[in-house]
Amino acid sequence: MNKTLYYIFIITITGVFSITSIQAAEVTLEKVWETDAIYKLPESVIYDKKRDILYVSNINEDGFKHLGNGFISKVSTDGKVVDMKWVLGLDAPKGLTISNDKLYATDINSLIEIDIKTGKILNRYVAPAAIHLNDVAADDKGQIYAADTLTDSIYRLNSIGLFAMWLNDTALEAPNGLHVEGNDMIIGSWGFPTDGFNTEIPGHLKIVSLIDKSIKSLGNAKPVGNLDGVEADGNGAYYVTDWINGKLLHIQPNGDSTLLLNLSSGAADLEVILEKKLIIIPLMKDNKLVAYKIR
């Protein structure tokens, strides 16, 4: 496979998608692998450092229907399938996170707890009022948070096994991607949907305090896209995917953004493995995974 170098320069786009950069340095991403179209609506990928393996959620057919044909794949970090249908019996799994040697997956209105050692489902925590549980993240206490994009809500599985609504506020602006840093949760907002998943004003990054649930925008609150995955870059900024427009963005603490990659629509919940300098992105509509080296 030929390797493609992507050189990212400072750009400014005017209008509602305001994308600028505070960085003067050139950023280089090298495409290192891309799978064939072998997945079934892959939504999220997460890295298990302990086992040096990736897990990929496959919605399979319909993200809103309880069809029972969703699954989770096990994949090597060089893009090779280890077990395509490692976990079965899911409906439409989306966000993934790992805590205390368990894998958690959102599944429409449920949070699924999986024993990583065996691949067996341990628990299904149901939130009857939830519509579209999306990304999921764990705090340092082992509590699990899940975004319900269409109800402007965050659910939490606490330390005693209670899964309930933790926060409901329109200021979340359709929360999608979640990333926990200490006592803060970084949220990739989709923006207020006006017709299905379309928006007049796209979303930006939000910060929610895990202490007092206060909500604020990251930096200047410029609309940047219909945000999906959010991961830290290790230097105070974030790699973020725009699902609708198929973009990889680099968002600074002041809210300014650099366009890193033009991908295809459906760029979903990415994983960033800092120690390997690797970014892995599910291309949901293309049924592929693609990986880039940070140079």
Positions of PLM-derived features:
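Bacterial N-terminal signal peptides
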Residues: 8-18
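Asp-box/WD-like beta-propeller blade repeats and closely related beta-sheet repeat scaffolds
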Residues: 29, 110-111, 116-141, 147
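A short beta-strand motif characteristic of beta-propeller blades
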Residues: 30-35, 80-86, 120-126, 162-168, ...
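Beta-rich, blade/repeat-based domains predominating
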Residues: 38-51, 57, 62, 67-69, ...
